[in-house]
Curated annotation (Swiss-Prot):
This protein's encoding gene: TRM8
Chemical reaction(s) catalysed: guanosine(46) in tRNA + S-adenosyl-L-methionine = N(7)-methylguanosine(46) in tRNA + S-adenosyl-L-homocysteine
GO molecular function: tRNA (guanine(46)-N7)-methyltransferase activity; tRNA binding
Ranges where the record places region Disordered: 1-101
Name of the protein described by the UniProt record: tRNA (guanine-N(7)-)-methyltransferase
Sequence intervals crossing the membrane: none
Binding residues for S-adenosyl-L-methionine: 122, 145-146, 199-200, 219, 297-299
InterPro entries: SAM-dependent_MTases_sf, Trm8_euk, tRNA_(Gua-N-7)_MeTrfase_Trmb
Described purpose of this protein according to its UniProt entry: Catalyzes the formation of N(7)-methylguanine at position 46 (m7G46) in tRNA.
Length: 325
């Protein structure tokens, strides 16, 4: 109450000239952010449909030296609330069925629907995908994010990473007298990661067929502390049945949070579901994805800086009773 009173006093103490100056500064900052996002949006539209069907002519040495590194996007120009209501009407675009989904727009140079098998639900700023990508270069990884500005940030980040890595790879090939030409791991350029604005709580089966995914990540989801908000948590009995549907037998659900109450909630619901079985601590210690998940996300790095705790639980998808008959 006292803080609010102090704030009111501070505002009332401002002169009309100071208030006018402050308003102009805020307006200039907002205009600058919008212009930055509009510029990135134009780049995004062009890059999204760049599909090379024929080998490009070899660049001359002079053109290679003029290739410039694309600037990575800046978070301050993508302001967004920390969380979004999953039950709101966000006017999202989604396919009627997985068969009608055109994945080639997201993975223009590495498209194969059978390989879309890793999903980061609520991917945030994309840190996990960017670390997982090189570890699974033959698999397609999709991040689902409901917030508009955050999704645009990740799109722009992936576009910049792809362009920059291709420049680096071309330079390495020229220095080594030419590449192998067989598309080995040395040619990796983040073509297997992509982000999509979507609501996993509503439309996940619209994107994936039964048993398509091998891994699902739920990293630092919204805890929804209030009792009446618990129905909006990303792990519930109903949603777990949907996750089990799109997850193949033996697939893994990865969860991590810095909120112990949410961790206990997720563990309770996963333990009670007949199609999931918790993996041991020994398994977690040996799995490279757990290590990446623990340290790669922006939220996880913030928890580390604040010396907070991280709670991990991983579950294996069990065979369905019908499949055992």
């Amino acid at each position: 109450m006292s803080e609010a009173t102090d704030k009111q006093k501070q505002v009332s103490a401002e002169t009309p000239l100071e208030r006018d100056l402050k308003s102009k500064q805020q307006s200039i900052a907002a205009t600058k952010r919008k212009q930055y996002r509009d510029d990135k949006s134009q780049i995004r539209k062009q890059a999204r449909f760049e599909v090379s069907t024929t080998p490009e002519p070899e660049q001359s040495d002079s053109s290679a030296t003029t290739a410039t590194i694309t600037e990575l996007p800046k978070k301050r120009y993508y302001r967004q609330r920390a969380h979004s209501n999953p039950f709101s009407d966000h006017r999202l675009e989604y396919p009627k069925s997985p068969e009608s989904m055109d994945w080639s727009n997201l993975y223009p140079k590495q498209y194969d629907i059978s390989k879309v098998e890793i999903a980061d639900i609520g991917c945030g700023y994309g840190g996990l995908m960017i670390k997982l990508g090189p570890q699974f270069p033959k698999s397609l990884i999709l991040g689902l994010e409901i917030r508009v500005q955050v999704t645009q940030y990740v799109e722009d980040r992936i576009i910049a990473l792809r362009k920059n890595q291709e420049i680096i790879n071309d330079k390495k090939k020229k220095e080594s007298g030419g590449g192998t030409g067989d598309g080995d791991d040395n040619d990796y350029s983040y073509q297997n990661i992509a982000v999509l604005r979507g609501n996993a709580m509503k439309f996940l089966p619209n994107f994936f067929v039964k048993g398509q995914l091998s891994k699902m990540f739920f990293c630092f989801p919204d805890p929804h502390f209030k009792q009446r908000k618990h129905k909006a948590r990303i792990i519930t009995n109903t949603l777990l049945s949907e996750y089990a549907y799109v997850l193949r037998e033996g697939g893994v659900v990865y969860t991590i949070t810095d909120v112990e109450d949410l961790h206990n909630w997720m563990v309770k619901h996963l333990d009670e579901h007949p199609l999931f079985e918790r993996l041991s601590k020994e398994w977690e210690d040996q799995d490279k994805c757990v290590e990446i998940m623990y340290n790669a996300t922006e939220e996880g790095q913030k928890v580390t800086r604040n010396k907070g705790s991280k709670w991990v639980a991983c579950y294996k998808r069990l065979p369905s009773p019908d499949d055992c008959e």
